[in-house]
Amino acid sequence: MNLKRLFPVLALAALMSNVVQARELKALGISMGSLGNPYFVTLADGATERAKELNPNVKVTSVSADYDLSKQFSQIDNFISSKVDLILINAVDPSAMASAIKKARDAGIVVVAVDVDAKGVNATVQTDNVEAGKLACQFLVDKLAGKGNVIIQNGPQVTAVTDRVKGCKAALAAAPAIKVLSDDQDGKGSREGGLNVMQGYLTRFPKIDGLFAINDPQAIGSDLAAKQLKRGGIIITSVDGAPDIENALKTDTQIQASASQDPWAMAQTAVNVGNDILNDKAPAEAVTLLTPKLITRDNIGTYSGWSSKH
């Protein structure tokens, strides 16, 4: 037997075997916090497009948990029953979803958290939300010259929100003459929630100089409430950089800044990371952080917006 000739043949066979064994992304399950929010719609659409680039025949199922824990548990169970290869999850409760995530992983499914971290996932892709909160609230501090009455309008207690509030508080803490009137009211992550909570603030507090809303929909709702009650002189900032906030920064509103995210790029990165893990390529870091940028009335003209068709 000619071993010199045999070894290259065996090596080639092994290489071809590895290529054949590469796993194709055939089915993707996406569970978002709320598809009533354009941000999450863009996340789902970005993930779908990237999955179809990897495999035009991929089956994508995108669902809204509506911030309902039991609903998201059922969605993960359905994904497992459907034998998806990859789940992208925007966890309603990062800790409580751990058992469902473990069940999916035990079934051989790769689970990647998007926008918020979640216990037990293979990897996470999200904005640096602490930095986003800092940027938005440092803007408030600067505009108010370090003094005044400020409100932090909170939201659903997922890590993206708690991290933004953490970053905001860090910026405000450096300005001792800033008084935080409230930081515990939940605007539900929605325009309606922001409007309702802001109406309460405006009734309770005769003087509000600034407000940080944890996302753009809440900021827009808050601005509307101030308009309805004819209250001016309030600087409103938020996080997202959504199309609606672009319009708000160009028109007659009290919204002055938003720390922008890129849900389209986030989703596409998450699919890439998940597909790599599916094929035994671990990411360099367990958590991929995307850097936010502050958009204001001064620089909105150069802002390219979310990198999608939205």
Predicted regions, residues:
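Bacterial N-terminal signal peptides that target proteins for export
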Residues: 1-8
